[in-house]
C-alpha cells in the first residue's frame, strides 16, 4: 500500500524532463516549480489502491504527468507592523562567520539531496516494478501457469520494496558494523577494520571520543575532515562511506586502503630507486593538488598520510588539520622549542656521510620511539613559517613533499639531527643546513634535476614553486605523464590474501607495535581524565552522511556522469 506522500512523488516523478537546476544547485528555469499562473489539475491514477494483479495491474504504467499543473500559492499582504526596526547585535558578524556559512551550505545540500534522492528512488523503483511485471506477464501466458503462485510472487516483491523503503529511513549506527581488527590509534580514538553487516562493505571505521573533542574544541577539525571526504570523488583522496554519531562517539567509515602507509614502505626499503621515488612523488603531488583544488591546505603532510591502495597507487588521508589553523597547543609547543634551542650549544654543522646521517636518523626514531606518533609532532616535514606561527599559503605542502622526496632517496630527512632539539636547530638555520648529499666517492647522490626540484620546494615562500602547473613543468618530471599515472604499474603492489587483510598495518596485539603509541596512550589517558562523564555532548549539525551506493533502492540515475560527488549530509 503506497502512502499519500509516495503517490504524490510518483505523480511528480512521472516525467523528469522538466527538472533542472541552475548554477547554484537550486530549482530554476522552467524546472520543478515554474513561475507562472496555472490551474491545479491533479489526476489520480485509476485503481491505485486496488489489489495487485500479476497479469495486468491497473496502476502500471502510471499516467504521464509531465504536464501536471500545480497551483501557484498566492501570498496575502504581510503585516509588517511588528517587524523589528533593526537587526540584532552582531548580526552581520554571526551571519558571515565560518560556522554559520557551513550550516547554511549543509542546509542547502540537505534539500537538494532530499529531492534528488527522492526522485532517484522513485525512478529506480519504477524500473524494478516494470521488470517484475513484465516477468509475471510472461509467466501468466505460459500453459499451466499457477495464478496463485504468481500472486504470491507479486506480494513477495511488494514486501521487499517495503523493506527497502524502511532501510532508507534508518540512520547508520555502530551496531551496523562488525569490527574485524584494530588498524590505527590516535589521540582522540581508534581506527578499526570493519564490515557493514547488511551491505558487506569493508571499511576503515574511525571512532572518536565525542566528549573529548568538545572539551578540547577540536570538533572543527573533525567537521573539516568529514567535509573534505564528502566533497570529492577524486581517486587520489580516501572516500567517505558513512558518517554518524551517538552520545559518546563520532564515527567516520572510510574506504579501507589495505597497502599500509608510505612510512611502512620506506622502513622496509630504507630508500627508493630514483625512478620509483619519481613515481611516488608524482602521485603525491596529484593527491595534494586534488586537495588544493577543493580550497584546502593540508599543513601537516608526512609519509604516514599517504596510503597505498590494493593496486599500489597513492591515496591521501587524514585531513583534520586542513581546517585552516593547527591547534594553538601544538604551535605554541613548537615555537617554545624553537626559541629554547637558540640558547643551546650545538656542534658546528659538518657534512656527514649518507650512511652516518641515515644511521643517526634511525637511531633517533628508535630512541624516541613515539617520535613519529607524538601528539605535538616532529619538525621533519613542516615548513618553518608554519612552526613559527607566521602567515603561510598552500605551498607549505610543497615544502613537505620536498622533504619526503629527499628522504625517499637517501633514507633521512634534510634537517634530521642526533636529537629532536638538533633537528629543530637545523630547521631554524635551514639555509645553512640544507646540503646536497654526497656519496662516499664524492659524487652527488641527487641528479641536477632532482636537486633543482628539491631546492624549489624547500625554499622561501617567494622562491617556492607556486602551482601544480609549475611543478609539472620542472625537468624532473619530463618523463612523467600525470594524466596516465593511475594506469601505470606501480613499483610495489600489496600482496593481499583477502579484502580484510590488514597485514600492512601495525598489530595492536603486539607489545612491540604498541610501544610506538606510548605517548599517544599516555596523553589520551590524561585528556580522558579531564572529561566529565556526566556531561551531555552536543550534536554536530550536518555530520551524518551515507554515500549514494549505500542508499537502499536508488540507482544513481540522476547523478550519472557527474565529475564530483554528491556532498550530501543528512540533517539528523
Swiss-Prot record:
InterPro entries reported in the protein's UniProt record: AGC-kinase_C (IPR000961), Kinase-like_dom_sf (IPR011009), Pkinase_C (IPR017892), Prot_kinase_dom (IPR000719), Protein_kinase_ATP_BS (IPR017441), Ser/Thr_kinase_AS (IPR008271), Ser_Thr_kinase_AGC (IPR050236)
Domain AGC-kinase C-terminal: 478-555
Keywords for this protein: ATP-binding, Cell cycle, Cytoplasm, Cytoskeleton, Kinase, Nucleotide-binding, Nucleus, Phosphoprotein, RNA-binding, Serine/threonine-protein kinase, Transferase
Residues bearing the modification Phosphoserine: 17, 20, 74, 374
GO biological process, one term: intracellular signal transduction
Modified residues annotated as Phosphothreonine in this record: 544
Domain of life: Eukaryota
Inducing or repressing factors: Periodically expressed in the cell cycle, with a peak before the onset of budding.
Catalytic machinery residues: 300 (proton acceptor)
A single GO cellular-component term on record: Sid2-Mob1 complex
Keyword check for Kinase: yes
Location of the protein in the cell: Cytoplasm, Cytoskeleton, Microtubule organizing center, Spindle pole body; Bud neck; Nucleus
A Pfam family matched in the record: Pkinase_C
Assembly and oligomerization: Interacts with MOB1. MOB1-binding is required for a late mitotic event.
Extra facts: Present with 3500 molecules/cell in log phase SD medium.
Function: Ser/Thr-protein kinase involved in the mitotic exit network (MEN) and required after the metaphase to anaphase cell cycle transition. Phosphorylates CHS2 to regulate its dynamics and chitin synthesis at the division site during cytokinesis. Coordinates septin and actomyosin ring (AMR) functions during cytokinesis through the phosphorylation of HOF1. In complex with MOB1, phosphorylates CDC14 at sites adjacent to its nuclear localization sequence, thereby retaining CDC14 in the cytoplasm. Also binds to SWI5 and CLB2 mRNAs cotranscriptionally to regulate their decay.
Record's protein name: Cell cycle protein kinase DBF2
Native species: Saccharomyces cerevisiae (strain ATCC 204508 / S288c)
